[in-house]
């Protein structure tokens, strides 16, 4: 992994493809990161953004390798705003999409049913979406 990072920093490669790892084995040998994404973030001193893509679809995740019990702690206005901005920057710079159109998913079933089964959509997700809309971004959600 470190050799791949070195080649990327030297601009000798355009990207890195990572393969599945057995986290237990790595942790037992001193690799104290839950996955490649977090390690790459630490090495680059940047917030990592995991993007999965194919010819028709590009998906970014707000969280990386964390237990489901910790997800709601990571769904904050600051994290969501930073993630969306990084994603917009990547879509524009890395993929040449001039005005990216982004859909933001809901956290709760049925987008929280207007607060009846979760308030994250009302208190966190929608205000951040509205903030990007005010900046002229094409963004939808929570979906």
Where in the sequence are the language-model features?
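Anion-binding alpha/beta catalytic cores of soluble intermediary-metabolism enzymes, centered on
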Residues: 1-143
